[in-house]
């Protein structure tokens, strides 16, 4: 089997990730809920994960990291806890439904938003952003990279734009955390949301958000915190403010192991290999007749994603053939990013997405390219 659906979730992970999850399930109590060794051990595991994420993102302090179940929950926390009725937000047509649907729901409560568009290859048009700013604009919300095309957002440009207009910069890093270097301080990012089960190589059910020191977010969920139990209000200090209830300690132990492995290898090293694998695939299919490639795989900051269609064939059928005849795992369809598909003209057909990991090999890439070549000739 060749697994090329890493933009959905990474299947191959360092062995220490699984071991960390198993060890935590056997030994960890409830963090922050006692003074005996199992609960203290759990607290240490959570803190280690917090420290690892802070180091990876170059956050100023581990307390800037609050954990959640995934990037979707983290984005709901950020978007639901920062704005008031009448506020305006700028976002892009590249966004995943984990951004869009919270915004649509908040629109019912009076939130306003505008979409920055893309060109015919799905590339953001930064020069047009100034036209979207209104007197009540409060934030710019952008993806680190499109999960459909792989086109990356120039976060340096986004930061300059946001702070020139006094806006918060909120980044959905689901596709970039762990696979591209990110320095939240250097980039002036106010909130960055991440998921653990993709390039961070952790288990599903893990994720969270970085929150700039001094920025207060109204919690999405309140309840047990392990501290200040007689107070009627949930604690306001980070990260407790955004972490009501018992955390997923085994999952966070696995996430910590994944992130520590990434730090040991070097994010730049992993990024270079993933970029090379995607480039190799692109090189071997870009000139095929009957194959249309979406996005601009040659642009800087491109995620290790190549999306295509073969003729007018439904993308789901291509994905089915790749699995049934070649044992290649890819993702077809809309990828929870409807506005990007509208921009690309692929609402009906969808696209076939190939997404690469450090654990893929050149041999797998070449075998997959050969399969696409065969299908392009047959269909």
Region locations from a protein language model:
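Pyridoxal 5′-phosphate
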Residues: 1-379
């Amino acid at each position: 089997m060749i697994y090329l659906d890493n933009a959905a979730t990474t299947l191959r992970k360092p062995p220490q990730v699984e071991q960390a999850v198993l060890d935590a399930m056997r030994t960890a109590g409830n963090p922050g809920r006692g003074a005996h060794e199992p609960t203290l051990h759990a607290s240490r595991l959570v803190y280690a994960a917090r420290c690892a994420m802070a180091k990876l993102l170059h956050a100023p302090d581990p307390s800037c990291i609050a954990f959640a179940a995934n990037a979707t929950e983290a984005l709901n926390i950020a978007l639901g806890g920062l704005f008031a009725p009448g506020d305006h937000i700028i976002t892009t047509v590249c966004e995943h439904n984990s951004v869009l649907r919270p915004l649509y729901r908040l629109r019912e409560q009076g939130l306003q938003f505008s979409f920055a568009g893309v060109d015919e290859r799905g590339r953001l048009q930064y020069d047009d952003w100034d036209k979207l700013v209104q007197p009540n604009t409060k934030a710019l919300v952008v993806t680190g990279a499109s999960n459909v095309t792989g086109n990356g957002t120039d976060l340096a440009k986004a930061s300059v734009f946001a702070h020139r207009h006094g806006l918060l910069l909120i980044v959905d890093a689901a596709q970039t955390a762990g696979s591209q270097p990110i320095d939240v301080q250097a980039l002036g990012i106010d909130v960055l949301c991440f998921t653990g089960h993709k390039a961070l190589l952790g288990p599903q059910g893990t994720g969270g958000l970085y929150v700039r020191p001094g920025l207060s977010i109204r919690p999405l969920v309140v309840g047990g915190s392990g501290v200040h139990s007689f107070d009627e209000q949930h604690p306001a200090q980070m990260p407790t403010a955004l972490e009501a209830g018992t955390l997923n300690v085994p999952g966070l132990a696995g996430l910590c192991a994944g992130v520590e492995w990434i730090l040991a290898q070097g994010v730049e090293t992993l990024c270079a290999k993933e970029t090379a694998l995607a480039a190799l695939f692109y090189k071997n299919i870009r000139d095929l007749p009957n194959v249309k490639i979406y996005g601009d795989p040659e642009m800087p900051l491109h995620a290790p994603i190549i999306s295509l269609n073969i003729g007018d064939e439904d993308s789901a059928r291509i994905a089915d053939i790749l699995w049934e005849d070649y044992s290649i795992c890819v993702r077809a369809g809309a990828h929870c990013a409807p506005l990007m598909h509208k921009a690309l003209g692929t609402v009906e057909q969808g696209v076939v997405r190939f997404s690469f990991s450090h654990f893929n090999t050149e041999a797998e890439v070449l075998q997959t390219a050969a399969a696409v070549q065969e299908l392009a000739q047959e269909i």
